[in-house]
């Protein structure tokens, strides 16, 4: 077991048994992204702050991910600036959200390509610019960006912020032991 601050960006750790990738160490904590996609619709329009996806991620999904320990996850500010620069939706503050399109670009070199198309929180445009409230940007299986209609059902590998001193286990926790050491440990436990 190690503190999150001991892991480099790109490392895989387990949070309550869920494999996550370390994206970045920030002043206010460490940003992680879940590696297993969940599927969900985005919502009735492209504003993440009032979307079905946000409600699900910060409700039932958060209950499961944290095993009821909601206080472990820190709130973070989510920039909902559209691809065309519209700031109509402003900043949303929540605990769990997909990455922004800018964050996908920032972490492109360490994020594995998705198994299926997945949502970002970034709208293509907003109603005040051209009346569009339907298109949301996302990540294709090729790693390229693209847009899709908000009422569709696609994947999400949500991100969340934990205190950097939070203790987690590396995904390959047993990899540091030799086979001999593991077998000896098993035999010593069998003798107890």
Where are these regions (language model features)?
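Collagenous Gly-X-Y triple-helix signature in extracellular proteins
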Residues: 1-173
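Short, low-complexity, charged amphipathic interaction modules
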Residues: 171-192
């Amino acid at each position: 077991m190690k503190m999150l601050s001991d892991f480099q960006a790109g490392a895989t750790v387990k949070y309550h048994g869920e494999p996550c990738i370390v994206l970045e160490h920030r002043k206010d904590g460490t940003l992680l992204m879940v590696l297993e996609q969940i599927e969900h619709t985005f919502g009735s329009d492209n504003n993440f702050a009032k979307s079905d996806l946000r409600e699900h991620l910060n409700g039932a999904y958060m209950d499961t991910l944290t095993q009821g320990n909601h206080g472990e996850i820190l709130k973070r500010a989510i920039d909902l600036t559209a691809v065309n620069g519209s700031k109509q939706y402003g900043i949303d503050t929540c605990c769990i959200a997909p990455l922004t399109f800018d964050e996908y670009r920032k972490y492109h070199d360490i994020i594995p390509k998705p198994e299926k198309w997945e949502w970002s929180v970034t709208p293509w445009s907003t109603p005040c610019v051209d009346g569009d409230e339907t298109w949301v940007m996302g990540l294709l299986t090729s790693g390229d960006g693209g847009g899709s209609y908000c009422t569709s059902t696609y994947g999400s590998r949500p991100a969340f912020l934990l205190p950097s001193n939070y203790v987690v286990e590396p995904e390959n926790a047993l990899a540091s032991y030799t086979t001999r050491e593991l077998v000896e440990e098993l035999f010593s436990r069998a003798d107890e």
